[in-house]
């Protein structure tokens, strides 16, 4: 349970997000069956969120916080750190495990 991180391509191995910093990422979110539900890449606009402010689901934040600058990783988030039993009506079914392809582009 929680978030599992699998590196796709390594980052610098030194620069990690700190609480209060803004992470600038590109991501694609998918259900376990591979169905894409969201992608900053498709919009061609990086997504920003602040670490420690609960602006994203817990698994996304916990996973990104363990990535180093420039890293691209697959984050597998179990329902307890995603949308849980409620899901996100019309988009995420209840008790769904979510998979994100995340690239940490920069920190602000």
From Swiss-Prot:
Q: Does the keyword Chloroplast apply?
A: no
Pfam (any one)? FKBP_C
Its Enzyme Commission number(s) read: 5.2.1.8
Which positions form S-S bridges? none
Gene Ontology CC: one annotated term: Z disc
The UniProt entry's GO biological process terms, in alphabetical order, are:
calcium-mediated signaling; insulin secretion; insulin secretion involved in cellular response to glucose stimulus; negative regulation of calcium-mediated signaling; negative regulation of heart rate; negative regulation of insulin secretion involved in cellular response to glucose stimulus; negative regulation of release of sequestered calcium ion into cytosol; neuronal action potential propagation
Q: Which family does it belong to?
A: Belongs to the FKBP-type PPIase family. FKBP1 subfamily.
User: What does the annotation say about its assembly with partners?
Assistant: Identified in a complex composed of RYR2, FKBP1B, PKA catalytic subunit, PRKAR2A, AKAP6, and the protein phosphatases PP2A and PP1. Interacts directly with RYR2.
Give the protein name, as stated in the record: Peptidyl-prolyl cis-trans isomerase FKBP1B
Q: Whose protein is this, by species?
A: Mus musculus (Mouse)
* Taxonomic path: Eukaryota, Metazoa, Chordata, Craniata, Vertebrata
- The coding gene here is Fkbp1b
């Amino acid at each position: 349970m929680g978030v599992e991180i699998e590196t796709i391509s390594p980052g610098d191995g030194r620069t990690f997000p700190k609480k209060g910093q803004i992470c600038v990422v590109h991501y694609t979110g998918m259900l376990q069956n591979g169905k894409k539900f969201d992608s900053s890449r498709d919009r061609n606009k990086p997504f920003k969120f602040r670490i420690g402010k609960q602006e994203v689901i817990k698994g996304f934040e916990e996973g990104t916080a363990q990535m180093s600058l420039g890293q691209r990783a697959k984050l597998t988030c179990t329902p307890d750190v995603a949308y849980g039993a409620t899901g996100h009506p019309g988009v995420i079914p209840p008790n769904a495990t979510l998979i994100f392809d995340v690239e940490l582009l920069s920190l602000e």
